[in-house]
Every structure is written in structure tokens, then in C-alpha cells.
Amino acid sequence: MKVVFLEDVKGQGKKGQIKEVPTGYAQNFLIKKNLAKVATAAALSEVKGQAKAKEKEEAELLAEAKALKEVLEKEDTVVEIKMKVGQTGHTFGAVDKADIAKALKSQFNLKLDKRKIQLINKIQALGTKDVPVKLHRDVTAVVKVKISEA
């Protein structure tokens, strides 16, 4: 029996997938638990419509990410963070992902999730650092972060 999976079923299929499964398994388990439905013409067209909508949404997200990358990688886009510095030249504290996200919001009005900023170690020295930001699975931008003395 051909079914359309409504949810991911381990070892059988993923959501939206059309697959041939044993009739008893389909009727007694998958359909009863609302994990799948019979693959009728209406169900197949619905799946195609959902796939098209998802593809369109994915394309929009990719376009947004590319536009944001253009803004972040402009020459004049430098995130400046001021920190107190000791006599030896080391900063008191460190700059982390949340600080960079907050500075982007306040200086350039760009709301960026701190989890997208790929800072491996906190920044503890004065100067300019290039910090990668993963905007989309296919788009990664590099933001210049300048740590200066307050």
C-alpha cells in the first residue's frame, strides 16, 4: 500500500515522503496513529504543494542571508566594543558572542542571534578581529570586531 508520511517514522520514512509499505502495517499502525495517510491523488498534490512552498521559503531565507552578508561585509561595518584595559594592556573581562550581537544591534540595528556567531574563544586583547557568522547553511559572513580602550 502506498502511503504519504505525515511525520518522520524511524526506519520507514520522513515527513512528506511517499513510500510503499505492507498493507497491515499501514492500516494498523501508521494510519491509526496519524503517522501516514493513504497516497490518493489529493494527498499527492498536497505534498507537492507543501514541497513547493518549502522550497520557496528556503529560497527567501537564502536571499535574506545573502543580503545580510553584503551589509555585514561592507568596509565601513566595523563593530566597535570599548573595554577597560589594565596597565599591562590586557582587557578586564572578555568579549563573547552575546556582546558582539548586542553591539551589532545597537550600532547597526541588525538583530542577529548570538548562536550564529562562530566565535571559538572569547576576545581578550585589543585590536581588530575577523569573526565568522553563519547566516544560513550555505552563507557565512565575516564581521570585523574592533576592541578599543574605554
Swiss-Prot record:
UniProt keyword rRNA-binding present: yes
Gene Ontology molecular functions: rRNA binding; structural constituent of ribosome
Pfam families registered for this protein in UniProt: Ribosomal_L9_C (PF03948), Ribosomal_L9_N (PF01281)
GO cellular component: ribonucleoprotein complex; ribosome
Keyword 4Fe-4S: no
GO BP terms: translation
Keywords: Ribonucleoprotein, Ribosomal protein, RNA-binding, rRNA-binding
Family annotation (InterPro entries): Ribosomal_bL9, Ribosomal_bL9/RNase_H1_N, Ribosomal_bL9_bac/chp, Ribosomal_bL9_C, Ribosomal_bL9_C_sf, Ribosomal_bL9_N, Ribosomal_bL9_N_sf
Role played: Binds to the 23S rRNA.
Family statement: Belongs to the bacterial ribosomal protein bL9 family.
PANTHER family: 50S RIBOSOMAL PROTEIN L9
HAMAP family for this protein: Ribosomal_bL9
Name of the protein in question: Large ribosomal subunit protein bL9
Underlying gene: rplI
